[in-house]
From Swiss-Prot:
It comes from the Bacteria. Pfam families: Ub-RnfH. Transmembrane segments: none annotated. InterPro entries: Mopterin_synth/thiamin_S_b, RnfH, RnfH_sf. Belongs to the UPF0125 (RnfH) family. This is Protein RnfH. It comes from Halorhodospira halophila (strain DSM 244 / SL1) (Ectothiorhodospira halophila (strain DSM 244 / SL1)).
Length: 97
Protein backbone atom coordinates (compact mmCIF):
# COMPACT_ATOMS: atom_id res chain seq x y z
CA UNK A 1 0.00 0.00 0.00
CA UNK A 2 1.25 3.50 -0.83
CA UNK A 3 1.98 5.95 1.91
CA UNK A 4 0.66 9.48 1.66
CA UNK A 5 2.43 11.42 -1.07
CA UNK A 6 3.41 8.23 -2.89
CA UNK A 7 1.85 6.54 -5.88
CA UNK A 8 1.42 2.79 -6.23
CA UNK A 9 1.88 2.09 -9.95
CA UNK A 10 1.88 -1.11 -12.02
CA UNK A 11 4.01 -1.33 -15.16
CA UNK A 12 2.89 -3.98 -17.66
CA UNK A 13 4.49 -5.45 -20.78
CA UNK A 14 3.01 -8.48 -22.52
CA UNK A 15 4.55 -10.87 -25.01
CA UNK A 16 2.88 -13.93 -26.50
CA UNK A 17 2.95 -16.43 -23.67
CA UNK A 18 4.50 -14.09 -21.10
CA UNK A 19 3.27 -11.09 -19.16
CA UNK A 20 5.51 -8.91 -17.01
CA UNK A 21 3.77 -6.97 -14.23
CA UNK A 22 6.01 -4.83 -12.03
CA UNK A 23 4.80 -2.76 -9.08
CA UNK A 24 6.63 0.42 -8.11
CA UNK A 25 6.15 3.13 -5.50
CA UNK A 26 6.84 6.61 -6.84
CA UNK A 27 6.62 10.12 -5.40
CA UNK A 28 3.55 12.20 -6.25
CA UNK A 29 4.02 14.07 -9.52
CA UNK A 30 5.82 11.17 -11.22
CA UNK A 31 5.25 10.52 -14.91
CA UNK A 32 4.75 7.48 -17.12
CA UNK A 33 8.42 7.72 -18.11
CA UNK A 34 9.46 7.79 -14.45
CA UNK A 35 7.46 4.61 -13.85
CA UNK A 36 9.10 2.81 -16.78
CA UNK A 37 12.57 3.77 -15.58
CA UNK A 38 11.91 2.93 -11.92
CA UNK A 39 10.33 -0.44 -12.72
CA UNK A 40 13.32 -1.83 -14.60
CA UNK A 41 11.07 -3.04 -17.44
CA UNK A 42 13.37 -1.44 -20.03
CA UNK A 43 16.36 -3.40 -18.70
CA UNK A 44 14.36 -6.61 -18.33
CA UNK A 45 13.05 -6.31 -21.92
CA UNK A 46 15.78 -4.62 -24.01
CA UNK A 47 13.67 -5.15 -27.15
CA UNK A 48 11.38 -2.32 -26.02
CA UNK A 49 11.99 0.70 -28.26
CA UNK A 50 10.06 3.71 -27.00
CA UNK A 51 10.73 5.55 -30.27
CA UNK A 52 8.57 2.91 -32.03
CA UNK A 53 6.27 1.67 -29.29
CA UNK A 54 3.43 3.47 -27.56
CA UNK A 55 2.80 3.74 -23.84
CA UNK A 56 -0.63 3.95 -22.25
CA UNK A 57 -2.48 4.13 -18.97
CA UNK A 58 -5.47 1.78 -18.74
CA UNK A 59 -5.68 1.45 -22.53
CA UNK A 60 -5.36 5.16 -23.36
CA UNK A 61 -2.17 6.16 -25.18
CA UNK A 62 -0.23 8.80 -23.26
CA UNK A 63 3.10 10.57 -23.52
CA UNK A 64 6.05 9.70 -21.33
CA UNK A 65 5.61 13.06 -19.58
CA UNK A 66 2.01 12.30 -18.52
CA UNK A 67 1.55 12.65 -14.74
CA UNK A 68 0.34 9.52 -12.98
CA UNK A 69 -2.25 8.94 -10.27
CA UNK A 70 -2.22 6.40 -7.48
CA UNK A 71 -3.28 2.99 -8.79
CA UNK A 72 -2.49 3.69 -12.47
CA UNK A 73 -1.31 0.87 -14.73
CA UNK A 74 1.34 1.95 -17.26
CA UNK A 75 1.30 -0.32 -20.32
CA UNK A 76 3.93 -0.70 -23.04
CA UNK A 77 2.32 -1.65 -26.35
CA UNK A 78 4.08 -3.83 -28.92
CA UNK A 79 4.00 -2.77 -32.58
CA UNK A 80 1.21 -4.32 -34.66
CA UNK A 81 2.31 -7.33 -36.68
CA UNK A 82 -0.48 -6.94 -39.27
CA UNK A 83 -2.29 -3.83 -40.44
CA UNK A 84 -5.86 -4.09 -39.01
CA UNK A 85 -7.36 -3.02 -42.35
CA UNK A 86 -5.45 -5.77 -44.17
CA UNK A 87 -6.48 -8.34 -41.55
CA UNK A 88 -10.18 -7.46 -42.07
CA UNK A 89 -9.77 -7.86 -45.84
CA UNK A 90 -8.21 -11.31 -45.37
CA UNK A 91 -10.99 -12.44 -43.01
CA UNK A 92 -13.67 -11.20 -45.43
CA UNK A 93 -12.00 -13.01 -48.34
CA UNK A 94 -11.83 -16.28 -46.37
CA UNK A 95 -15.46 -15.95 -45.31
CA UNK A 96 -16.58 -15.29 -48.91
CA UNK A 97 -14.84 -18.40 -50.26
Amino acid sequence: MSSEGELGIEVVYALPGQQTVLRVELPAGSTAGDALNASGVLERHPEIDLTRQSVGVFGQIVGLDTPLHNGDRVEVYRPLQVDPKEARKRRAARKAS
